[in-house]
Regions:
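Ser/Thr-rich, low-complexity intrinsically disordered terminal regions
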Residues: 20-129
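C-terminal motif of bacterial Sec signal peptides marking the signal peptidase cleavage site
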Residues: 15-18
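Bacterial N-terminal signal peptides that target proteins for export
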Residues: 1-8
């Protein structure tokens, strides 16, 4: 293999390894479901969101009727989401971030994992309600 071919292969590997962004994941209208099948109140849904967030290090703040804002700070990285909810559904949508390379609808790939974990946590708390 020539040096230029080796260099090209190395450059490609570095470029691919540097791909640390992914499209921003938003959760839209996830169903509110309890294990018993009984409808939950707004207070129960809010409490489930707060418990799920707290268990994962999110700071949850009520910003208005049926609207929570979640903030996750890990070292120098900050993610902020808004979580509108009702007795039937909730959403988790990107609001802002610091040091997460957000630009043009893409963000650091770890962000989506945090949102998936938060969504799973909320669903687990709703089921337990």
């Amino acid at each position: 293999m020539h040096i230029s071919a080796k260099f090209g292969a190395l450059l490609l590997a570095v470029v691919l390894a540097g791909c640390t962004t992914a499209p921003i994941m938003n959760v839209s209208e996830a169903s509110v479901v309890s294990a018993s099948g009984k409808p939950l109140t707004n207070d129960q849904v809010r409490a489930a969101i707060v418990r799920a967030g707290a268990a994962l290090g999110w700071q949850m703040k009520e910003e208005g009727p049926n609207l929570m804002v979640g903030t996750l700070q890990l070292r120098t990285h900050v993610a902020v989401v808004q979580i509108p909810y009702s007795t039937k559904a909730y959403s988790v949508t990107y609001r802002s971030s610091v040091n997460l390379e957000e630009k043009g609808g893409v963000i650091h790939k770890n962000y989506n994992g945090w949102i998936q974990n938060l969504t799973r946590g909320i669903n687990a708390q709703l089921s337990a309600s």
